[in-house]
């Protein structure tokens, strides 16, 4: 699939001449060629432009991980959330403590929007960094809500003891519904998970999926 991206004030083009429809996030063959001032950009910059200036749909990405994370998982949660928020993605998490709080902290530190999908019926259970707490009252079934509401999920941990079966369920739901599921260093091993070594790599993968590039 062509992945050369050309950006101008008028829109975003792919190397094969297709232009992105920001509302449907689908590529359509353009009537006109990219203007002379169009410049080549990476997926992260292109996604940021679509989200901020191109009137694109603000699809949320999810950060998932355990309530009792290791220091590495905490660091990855904060770094990935920060990288995604800097592009302009609204984020979803479970809304409470552990990796969820670290992700919320990283997101809000750079002015991002964090949505917390809470299992209880009390929005006050959300950590202090959640901007929009959604009290579902559906218990662990909220894991399915997180996995299907996000177009991409990044798992930052859950493989180390104690194993996070909640995180595994979110990853499995995401894979079942065709979402991009990224695994950082300590994420559980599941078939279909895309492994990333850094927050920047994860953010680039999420941006490419948002732009329907892979």
Label the model's feature ranges.
Residues 32-38, 69-72, 121-128, 183-198:
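Generic structural signal for short, solvent-exposed loop/turn connectors between secondary structure elements
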Residues 133-137, 193-212:
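Short acidic-hydrophobic, aromatic-tinged amphipathic segments that line or gate anion-handling sites
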Residues 3-114:
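Glycine-rich beta-alpha loop segments
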Residues 89, 108-112, 176, 207-212:
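Generic secondary-structure signature for well-ordered alpha-helical cores
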Residues 75-78, 82, 101, 144, ...:
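Amphipathic, non-transmembrane alpha-helical secondary structure
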Residues 78-79, 94, 98-177, 183-191:
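Acidic/glycine-enriched connector segments
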